[in-house]
């Protein structure tokens, strides 16, 4: 990781903290109480998805939020290992009917289930679901039915096979379709229903499915250790059995090289969906929807680069740095930037790829495909033209050309002044902390520095 990239991440973190004001619908008194509580539940279940959902435009934002909460409720039932199968299966299969029942709640989740509270207050979600237009409700209901059936099938399979529910790569694709691909398909239908995107997007099922599969497969790779400790095995036997006779042996230090080769095989499988993700993003025309879809996809390719040939995957949950995540959020605002970020992380994977790995060729081919698709979607010559046009536009704005004059009114000047004050105070505070730490170190280790010591360094 270069120093320049680290500095850029720090800059993005400061910019995000100081100037990025996220909508606070969960605390806004002007928002109806039920909707407010739904936003609070959204924050509780997923901070990352909450950020991108809240940035969606009116008319689609609440539909996507309810869609997410409904499927998160379904997922919470599936993930709960304390629920007996005879209790779990009917709930999963009938969940699409349950969301039509006013007042329904569920209090039998395990005490350690992290999203337990969502089901305890699920009547709030149902009430807002019933307030959506019929078109939105039909999309959510249909996807919930398909997903519930798929989850029930794989839950019963895991029960029969001591936690193993995925045997072949075909099973793997099918499972990921049920738990994530359907989310991508449902979102495409919601976007088309809102009229904010082309109606034909609702029929782009293959690439919509890939959008979800890419995210899910990356998460399954990253969560190896967490899932293994919970006796949940989502890596397909068809892949891991080539490297070990027991799934748990991948954790053993003696098998580290075989484990990394297995990880490479899983990475190659996930990369097959990256090109579809880029093609899907190229079809979006609404800025907020583009951001909503692009940010998780870039996060996924960044995570894949972080876990690739990383032995820590088998011991802990590997995540990208916070500064890296913020940098992705700020930059994933157009197709050019997204292609550039995909290329950056794809090249990180290609750089770590080694000819000693039996999957070297597969990884190289998939990385090459991403390069080709990025070039076809946004050729290099157009990137240079885009950069020049963008710089020219900024220059015109600064000069005050056209109808948009770069003259700040008093209110804007006051806001900028306050922001600069905050930045200055933050910098001074950091320097103060550094000085205090140095003082403590000098005191503890009895270090004495005299002015003559500085003179000997010939600094002045």
UniProtKB/Swiss-Prot annotation:
Membrane topology per record: Single-pass membrane protein
Essential cofactor(s): Mg(2+)
Biological processes, Gene Ontology terms: ergosterol biosynthetic process; farnesyl diphosphate metabolic process; isoprenoid biosynthetic process via mevalonate
Catalytic reaction(s) noted: 2 (2E,6E)-farnesyl diphosphate + NADPH + H(+) = squalene + 2 diphosphate + NADP(+); 2 (2E,6E)-farnesyl diphosphate + NADH + H(+) = squalene + 2 diphosphate + NAD(+)
EC number, as in UniProt: 2.5.1.21
Tree of life domain: Eukaryota
Intracellular or extracellular location(s): Endoplasmic reticulum membrane
Gene Ontology molecular-function annotations: squalene synthase [NAD(P)H] activity
Segments traversing the membrane: 425-445
SUPFAM superfamilies per the UniProt record, alphabetical: Terpenoid synthases
One GO cellular component, as annotated: nuclear outer membrane-endoplasmic reticulum membrane network
Pathway: Terpene metabolism; lanosterol biosynthesis; lanosterol from farnesyl diphosphate: step 1/3; Steroid metabolism; ergosterol biosynthesis
Quaternary state and interactors: Interacts with pof14.
Family to which this protein belongs: Belongs to the phytoene/squalene synthase family.
Function: Squalene synthase; part of the third module of ergosterol biosynthesis pathway that includes by the late steps of the pathway. Erg9 produces squalene from 2 farnesyl pyrophosphate moieties. The third module or late pathway involves the ergosterol synthesis itself through consecutive reactions that mainly occur in the endoplasmic reticulum (ER) membrane. Firstly, the squalene synthase erg9 catalyzes the condensation of 2 farnesyl pyrophosphate moieties to form squalene, which is the precursor of all steroids.
Protein name: Squalene synthase
Native source species: Schizosaccharomyces pombe (strain 972 / ATCC 24843) (Fission yeast)
Lineage: Eukaryota, Fungi, Dikarya, Ascomycota, Taphrinomycotina
Gene that produces this protein: erg9
């Amino acid at each position: 990781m270069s120093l320049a990239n680290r500095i850029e991440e720090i800059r993005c973190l400061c910019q995000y903290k100081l100037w990025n004001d996220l909508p606070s619908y969960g605390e806004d008194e002007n928002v109806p109480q039920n909707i407010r509580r739904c936003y609070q539940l959204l924050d509780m279940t997923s901070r990352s998805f909450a950020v991108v959902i809240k940035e969606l435009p009116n008319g689609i934002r609440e539909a996507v939020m309810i869609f997410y909460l409904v499927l998160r409720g379904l997922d919470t039932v599936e993930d709960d290992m304390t629920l007996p199968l005879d209790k779990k299966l009917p709930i999963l299969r009938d969940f699409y009917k349950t969301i039509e029942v006013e007042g329904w709640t569920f209090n039998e989740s395990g005490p350690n289930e992290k999203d337990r509270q969502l089901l305890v207050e699920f009547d709030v979600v149902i009430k807002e679901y019933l307030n959506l237009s019929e078109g939105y409700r039909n999309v959510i209901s249909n996807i919930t039915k398909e997903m519930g059936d798929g989850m029930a099938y794989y839950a019963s399979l895991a029960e029969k096979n001591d936690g193993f529910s995925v045997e072949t790569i075909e099973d793997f694709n099918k499972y990921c379709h049920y738990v994530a691909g359907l989310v991508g398909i449902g979102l495409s239908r919601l976007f088309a229903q809102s009229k904010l995107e082309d109606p034909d997007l609702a029929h782009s099922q293959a690439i919509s499915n890939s959008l979800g599969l890419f995210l899910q497969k990356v998460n399954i790779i990253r969560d190896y250790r967490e899932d293994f400790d919970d006796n949940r095995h989502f890596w397909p036997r068809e892949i891991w059995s080539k490297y070990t006779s027991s799934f748990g042996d991948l954790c053993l230090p003696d098998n580290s090289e075989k484990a990394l080769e297995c990880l490479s095989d899983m990475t190659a499988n996930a990369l097959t969906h990256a090109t579809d993700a880029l093609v899907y993003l190229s079809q979006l025309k609404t800025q907020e929807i583009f951001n909503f879809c692009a940010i998780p996809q870039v996060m996924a390719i960044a995570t894949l680069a972080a876990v690739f040939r990383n032995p820590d995957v088998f011991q802990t949950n590997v995540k990208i740095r916070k500064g890296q995540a913020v940098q992705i959020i700020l930059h994933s605002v157009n197709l050019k930037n997204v292609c550039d970020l995909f290329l950056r992380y794809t090249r990180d994977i290609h750089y770590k790829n080694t000819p000693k790995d039996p999957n070297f060729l597969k990884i190289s081919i998939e990385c090459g495909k991403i390069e080709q698709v990025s070039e076809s979607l946004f050729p290099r010559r157009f990137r240079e033209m885009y950069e020049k046009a963008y710089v020219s536009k900024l220059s015109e704005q600064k000069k005050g050309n056209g109808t948009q004059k770069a003259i700040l009114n008093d209110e804007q000047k006051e806001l900028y002044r306050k922001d600069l004050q905050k930045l200055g105070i933050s910098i001074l505070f950091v320097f103060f902390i550094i000085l205090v730490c140095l003082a403590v170190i000098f005191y503890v280790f009895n270090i004495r520095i005299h002015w003559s010591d500085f003179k000997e360094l010939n600094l002045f």
